[in-house]
Amino acid sequence: MKHLEGDIVWVPHTVNGYCRGKIIGYNEKNQVTVRLLELNEEIKINEQLIQNYNQSDDKDFSDMVEIQDLSEAIILNNLGLRYKSDQIYTYIGNVLISINPYKEIKDIYSLNILNKYKDINTIKSNPPHIYAVALRAYQSMVSEKKNQSIIISGESGSGKTEASKTILQYLINTSNSNSNNNTNINNNNNSIEKDILNSNPILEAFGNSRTTKNHNSSRFGKFLKIEFRSSDMKIDGASIETYLLEKSRISHRPDVNNLSYHIFYYLVMGASKEERERLGLDNDPSKYRYLDASTSVIESFKKQSNGGSGGGSGNNDLSESLQLVKQSLESMSIAKEQCDDIFLTLAAILHLGNIEFEVDQTENEQTSGFSKISEQKASVKKSLSMVSKLLGYPEQVFKQTLLNRNLKGGGRGSVYCRPMEVYQSEQTRDALSKALYVRLFASIVEKINVKFIQNTGSKDLQGGYSSKRNNLFIGVLDIFGFENLSSNSLDQLLINFTNEKLQQQFNLNVFENEQKDYLQEGIPWSTSNFIDNKECIELFEKKSYGLLSLLDDECMMPKGSEVTLLEKYNKQYHNTNQYYQRTLAKGTLGIKHFAGDVTYQTDGWLEKNRDSIPTEVEQLLSASSNNLIKSLFNLKELNKSNDNNSNNNNSNNNSSSSSSSQSTASITAKASPPRERFNSGSGSGTTSPLNLSGSSSPLSGSGSYSIIGGNSNSNSNNNNSSNNKKSQSVSVAGQFIEQLNKLISTINSTSVHYIRCIKPNVTMDCNNFNNSHVLSQLRNVGVLNTVKVRKMGYSYRRDFIQFYSRYNCILNSLNIKINLTNINHSNLCKEILENVNSQYKNNNNNKNNNNQIVKITTNSKPTFQIGKTKIFISDELYIYLEKKRYDSLVDSVLKIQAFFKMIKIRNQYKRNKESSLFLQTLIRAQRAKKDFEQLVILENKRKEEERKKELERQRKEEEERQKELERQRREEEKELERKRKEEERELERQRKEEEKEQERKRKEEEKEQERKKKEEKEIEKKRKEEEKKKKKNEQNLSLPSLDITNSPSLINTTTTTTTTTTTTTNTSSPPLSPPISPRPSTPSSTSSSSSTTSSPSTKKQLLFKFNSISNLLSKSLHGSSHSDKNSKEDNNSNNNNNGDSTIILSSDSSFGQPTPKATSTPTPPPPPPLKTQPVPISSGVENNSSPNLWSHRNSPNFNGLVREKSRARIGRLTIRSASPLDLTYLPDPSKNEGSPQFTSQSLDFTPNIPPIITNSIVEQQSSLSGINKPIPQRTISSSENSPLSRANSSISSSLLILTPTLTSLSTSTTPSTPTTPKTPTTLSSSSVSTSTSLSSVSSSVSSSSSSSIPTPIIESTPSNSNEDLITTLSSPISTGHTGESIEEKNKRFRIKIINELIETERDYVRDLNIVVEVFLNPIREKQLLSAKDINSLFSNIEILFSINMNVLKALEKDKDPLCENISVGQTFLDMSHYLKMYTTYCSNQQNALKILEEEKIKNQPFREYLEFCMNDSVCRGLPLNSFIIKPVQRICKYPLLIKETIKFTPNDHPDKPALEEVDKKISDIVQSINEAKRTLELFQKIVDLQNSIDGLEDTNLMEQGRTLLMEGTVSAVKELNSEDSLSRTLFLFNNLILICSFGTNVLSTAINQFKTKKLKLKAKIPISDSRLIFVSDTDSVKYALEIVNIKEDSNYILCFNNDQDRSKWFKQIKALIQEQKLSNAKKAATIGNSRLIQTTS
């Protein structure tokens, strides 16, 4: 409804509930600014929350139904007004609202006031009072002959108990009952009225306690029936039914500010000294665990106690309160002995609470886990003794019952005793205490009911007392109100369900009152407006599927739990019942009650619903010597009582409907079911030995209902056993539902009257009205539901005059004419409503669609009704009426304002018009002139600017055109210049090549001619001195070990021998076929050898021949190769000269490879040999001449010569190996002569056979079979395996040893039968080469003069035949790529690189699969990490695996051994758009490794799983972090592989463009990754360095190196952080690698771990002593390492600590290569000098 500015409205307020406010203004979004009148402050609030304020309603209403605009705000305001004037009672219809004043109000309950409410006709004239409610109930019973009920509800402390007592006093006074009944044979001179009053102190003492909210809080529900004789309506009897006694208050109170039941404090602090001594009690409550509380609270309780009522302000002590209870018990015909037994039971409960338990220990002080009675306190033993004494059984038996539990065995009658734990014993103790009190309370209630029967009833045929069936009753229900605590359990669920049932009944009652009002006014009434909470109630009590039924079912399950119960609730009612709410919190559910939404915690529901005590404890109590205790737990008497009550119930059910269900059948005691808040036990037998009368329970098999779980029949022991089990299955919820249904059934059969008690404040202060607290209670008790019911109908009801006076302002807008002489308010009101209603419907028709129109016209109720005296208006029409009124008032105000504004403006206009007319004329003329001039100037400026812009545009276009022409001209010039230069370069290159070719041919022809001439001369000399040569050869074969440096004659002999052996070469012989069979010397050869002599002419010939050999060796060293023509001429020449043939012993492992051109630059040395300890690197170039350059310190295995087995490039691209014949020189410091020692470790030489010199040339006779033509040569660096190059006269020594031996082999020209050697061996392919020269050997001889290395001593082993050497050299020879062209060589390399790339991709896919299958999927399935951490740790690893799998399939698609059809470039180009994933993966890598380290520290399951994976053979011992970094490492390797593929791919190959494009893309990605970029650059430098060493390209050990690499198993890799500055060392085991740091526990732990696995620690190599091997990073365990085999066949990997160490190593590599190049250059110069000297000689 629209409100005007300045209107007074009701505004919601958090503290005051509602406040009056004045509207100041409207804001955007329906926000209203209101000034609160009481608080003088401004707030902004939504317009929808404002409630209408009617000044006529702002006054004191005794009946709030009279309020016209009934709302929450006006109800709250009216109650506050009346409370301030001490008017605590207010009507709202037939509901009485009572507010607790917390003070005495004078004469409010005096006899005079009571007498005013004796006449029913004076009720409306008298103010509201609780007497009026009692009077209305009494008169209704009298006049209608119908039972009545008065329901009193409200929260604790609102005055419910006092209200019930007030009603009881009124009814007793009104009935004028006689003091006794003459028909009662047991006339005790006590009237029923007195009995009813005397029962109140007993019930309050045993059922009330002090809480923080109420000093006399009833902890149970009570329904008191006061019966009246139908003849004279005098009180004739009474009965009490109790509900939900709070038994948990016995053992567990919320805090020290809450006390236990009053009776305990009366007994402790009010009993006499003799009584305390007899009961063993002390007068201090703090000495009892069940009573201990705050001292201030106990003192306050003593002051406020008044005769047990607890409600007064007297100063009576507790002895008087205890005495009042005793007197009340005696008045209930309870004998003194029975009273003593009651107090004895109470004392036993207190002593029982002081029994403490502790864990029992065995003799050796070990904990057994079972409980025992605490022996540390003497008070515990005293309490145990007192409990046994008071309850009437032996102490030891009771003790065993608390400590042990009996279990039935599988056999017949077998029972086992099982000790209990401490908590179980404590639970048994507390359960026993609660059971004793609850059953004692029920027994007292039963005795009170029996007393009521004795005073009013008569004996039946069986001698018992029965009530008359035709009596009427008035029931007073004192029930707990709605509860919504911070923690709500099963107790609150049952309480709120009770209030739901009562609210349903209340709604029905209000509905009937509304119907009555409508019928009086003649208004049609529809039941569709009824507010019903039936669905909410069915949610609780629906059979089989209700909340309580499901709870009972779950309690019967063997493994039932609250979790499964909640799952059943959610499955059954989630999204199917609007009142059930599924909550997010664990173990909770929500219910939408009429008073608000409540969240319940399900913890402990099953135990509370069962609420049992051990059977042995109950059996022990039933056998007590105490009569009271025995009667409380005697099953036979209980069953008898059940049978009697069942018979009474059956007879009562046959009575008429008006009185049968509420007459004397209900006077038997009705005990309450237990609960933890208001609780008493069910199946445990913890309640009164009584039955509830009435209809049979749906949970019980008989017509009666046993509260304690007793038997319906006790005819036999078997029946007792079976029935006991059956009754024990009845739960607390089942008892509660049955009792509640009976109560509601009883109430529904009566006329109900309501009293809603309100607590004005929380602090229980007088004259303090807390609006917000009162408002919440009004909602909880259902008062505001009355407002809702009215608003569902016609909430606005006014008489005709009031309506006309308010809405007569809209008559003009409605065009309604009024007859002022005769005004008919009824007709005018009707005419106004009809016109407004018509407009309202028209507006709805314009706004709504056709469906909504049909709904309005057919389904909606009439918007107004006109009664006899009132007008009933709906909310919608009322809002529209108020809007029309507002619009009418606004329209009137606007018209008035417009009229006065018009007059004012008109007068002002006339005054200003004449004075301004002249001035306006002048000003306008001057302004027009200036405007014209300004327009002319602006127009000129505009034209000038346009002209300039046009000229500027033309100029720029011309400049652009000229620039374009100039650019085209320059491009043409550059293109022409480029073509010209290319043509010139091409011509110049061709010219130079032709000149070089001509010069080379010329020189070769000259040399060939000169060589032929010399050979012709030598042939002549050979013929003359042949006999002399033979004799000298025989002498040389018998020589011992010679020293070439000390015997000049040896040189002469060598020269002669060399000259002689050159005459038997046969170049046309077939290739040498392994093995070479040695031939025996013929007799002719022996005689020839013996006839040879030494003469000056012979020496001259030998010198000439030696110079020829030196020239050949020099040509080979400097790359001089013969052309095809010269080769043919040489062959022809050799054929003419008896077919000379040469055998070359080479160190090339790749023999058979085509011989590349030799360059003038000497090749650097290869890395040191394999099969040895690492050789240290020289620190700089300064130590190049050091004799210990290649020395190895601390080599325990061997000294001297070592060889190189393999050498690796980065990755697997160019892993090479050297020849097994390579020799290394090393001075032996152990020998005094300082002579170097030579050793070979590749061939199987014996110590007696001298080593074979690398690249030596021997001539062989043509008579050797299998040698037909020369084997192609391999150019050998002068420094390769280079100790020979540094030795003086080493070549001469070699020739000395080899020439005679081989010469002797060639003396015979006729084939003969071969002789089998004693120790045959084969000649390795790596020891024989096909074409060579003696230049390298000659250079070694020449360089001896400038070398500082001592001359080596070569020892010769004596040999008597030529077979020894041949036997030693007989090794297999493999065929090589003879005459291979460059294209074929490139093709071969391309195949190897592509195969390497496929293997690399295969390894990569395998590693990615390991990450996904071994790590990612199990971690995700086992939920070892969160989803976020898994995404951060593994990033795009699954996508990368899929992509690379597709790449591998594409590469392996064509099984082409030549790799011609494999499109490497196109394959990688197809996946290039995924390359950016590597950038993302790399940027996330640091965070991933950080998460990995953190989770390994704090996440034990994750850490254990990683350790488990380390032991998995699939992972090869690599940790997870090594696999995580593999994608970035792999993308860094691709550029090298792609570049190598491009290098050996022809330009016309179809895959070449794709390769170049993908190379650019991958390189760009790699460059963007900082770490990968650094690694790639470092790899490239190493590749460039190794490319500078000659001979590496011809080595083919790539597959062998890969095999070695993959065989190495990495067990564990420990990575150090960047902050660690400790030096790193690599510890090696059997193929197990561990990277650690010094000074940490990781090292010792790892070593101990390997020792326990019986793994031997083999080596420890610091960086300073490492081999020449390289690892770019400690993480690159697979991609940048070289595996070196030592004697123990372990794997060495070098890991650098930092970039400085790596840079130092890199410099050492450079220095070594430069040193080797310089050494080669010096040796080449020495060879030239040697040749010059020989020629001169």
UniProtKB/Swiss-Prot annotation:
Residues 926-1039 form a coiled coil. Residues 59-886 form the Myosin motor domain. The gene is myoM. It holds the Pfam family SOS1_NGEF_PH. Residues 947-1028, 1121-1131 have a biased composition (Basic and acidic residues). Monomer. This is Myosin-M heavy chain. Residues 640-727, 947-1099, 1117-1199, 1266-1290, 1304-1364 are annotated as: Disordered. It comes from the Eukaryota. SUPFAM superfamilies: DBL homology domain (DH-domain) (SSF48065), P-loop containing nucleoside triphosphate hydrolases (SSF52540), PH domain-like (SSF50729). It comes from Dictyostelium discoideum.
